[in-house]
A protein has these predicted regions:
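Donor-nucleotide binding loops and adjacent catalytic segments primarily
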Residues: 80-82, 89-166
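Acidic donor-binding loop of glycosyltransferase active sites
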Residues: 165-174
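A nucleotide-sugar donor-handling region in carbohydrate enzymes
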Residues: 39-95, 99-102, 130-131
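A short alpha->beta transition loop at the rim of the catalytic pocket in nucleotide-sugar-dependent
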Residues: 168, 186-188
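Nucleotide-sugar donor-binding patch of glycosyltransferase catalytic domains
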Residues: 188-219
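Short alpha-helical segment that forms part of, or immediately flanks, the ligand-binding pocket
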Residues: 161, 179-185, 204
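Conserved donor-nucleotide binding/catalytic region of nucleotide-linked donor-dependent transferases
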Residues: 213, 218-239
Length: 239
């Protein structure tokens, strides 16, 4: 919204002469997104249009519920067996994808330990992003728990869609882009935590649609294990 506000101000002051399109990359829109001199609002999903029209007075002719743009590879056909073979993973094991880079170091270490203790028969893909400290600490924890053969620890990756395609569940914070990519892959979500504001709104959207569960602080690991073992529930969440 900050960039949109800046562009709106520059247009009002006749300092730029360009079309302005506001792409709302979350599943709810706050007042801060709505400013004059915007030619189009692109929404993540159609139901958001009602709020823009009724509450914020946006002209429906400039509202386009086209979705958040992502790469085509998230929706393209894939070969699970081939991906698993290339990545050294077992295609027959329940697989949990943990997007650990967005969590605090201490919390994700204890959370992974709890998962490993409760589900040693499952396999885990843990992506830390560019968090070097977290990567190093997780290496130690994985060795301590004896889960080297059942855990693939990754730093920054450019093919996250492959890991989404072969996973049964993703554990993540509900950022707009990750949510969209997971939905495109029909990947059920377990929401680790959600800050008030856009993340909380995204979480509410997913919970209302039945595409995610919200993990409880003390029993989050149990929630995940129980869900992954409930194939019927997982299939419902994919729809």
């Amino acid at each position: 919204p900050f960039v949109t506000t800046m562009v709106s101000k520059l247009r009002r002051q006749h300092k730029i002469d360009v079309k302005a399109i506001s792409l709302i990359t979350d599943y709810d829109a706050h007042r801060t997104y709505i400013v004059p001199y915007v030619d189009a609002y692109v929404l993540a999903e159609p139901d958001m249009a009602t709020k823009l029209i009724d509450e914020y007075g946006v002209d429906k002719s400039i509202i386009y519920p086209l979705g958040i743009p992502i790469f085509d590879r998230f929706t393209e056909p894939f070969d699970k067996k081939a991906i698993c073979e290339r990545e050294g993973l077992d295609p027959n094991k329940p697989t949990i994808l943990l997007m650990a880079g967005s969590f605090g170091v201490t919390s994700v270490l204890s959370f992974y330990k709890a998962l490993a203790e409760r589900a040693p028969e499952m396999q885990f893909i843990v992506i830390t992003g560019r968090n070097i400290k977290l990567f190093a600490n997780l290496e130690k924890v994985i060795e301590e728990t004896g889960m080297q053969d059942n855990t693939k620890l990754l730093y920054f990756v450019k093919n996250v869609e492959d890991y989404m395609h072969i996973s049964d569940l993703i554990v993540t914070k509900p950022g707009g882009l990750t949510v969209t990519e997971s939905l495109a892959c029909s990947l059920p979500m377990a929401i680790y935590s959600a800050f008030p504001g856009q993340e909380r709104d995204n979480a509410e959207f997913l919970l209302n649609k039945g595409a995610a569960i919200m993990l409880r602080k003390k029993t989050g690991a149990d929630d995940i294990v129980n869900l992954v073992k409930d194939k019927e529930k997982l299939d419902e969440m994919k729809e």
